[in-house]
Amino acid sequence: MIEGEWAGQVTGLGDQQVEIAMMRTPDGHNRLELSRFLRPGIIADHRNAPVNALGYLRAMFTVDDIHETLERLGKHGVELVGDVVDYRDVYRLCYVRGPEGLLIGLAQELS
């Protein structure tokens, strides 16, 4: 269960509660996150949908430098959804929304 102020800052949802299952691909090089948002309620319009909207509306990528990536993507119309937040000195995380409304998560490994 993921909840708390830091999580709401990353997603821009404020008070949230989400169950997450993290799976590793058989080759060990990638991971797939499955999320079920319990709080807040769900909104259906994907163009302005929050991070917890139903359906496949987001993907997450590992980046070497999250701030450099944000600067580069910002030049192409990508906007930060919530805040850039550190999770337990393990990851620096954020979500961005591209010009077509697709949500992209960015994760920088800190260790």
What are the language-model segments listed below?
Residues 1, 55-61, 107-111:
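N-terminal beta-strand motif that seeds the catalytic metal site of vicinal oxygen chelate
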Residues 1-5, 82-85, 108:
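Conserved catalytic-core motifs of GNAT/GCN5-like acyltransferases
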Residues 1-29, 75, 94:
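Core segments of cupin and vicinal oxygen chelate
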Residues 4, 38-41, 110:
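Feature marks short, surface-exposed loop/turn motifs that line or immediately flank catalytic pockets
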Residues 14-20, 99-106:
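Short, structured secondary-structure boundary patches
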Residues 26-31, 36-103:
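Vicinal oxygen chelate
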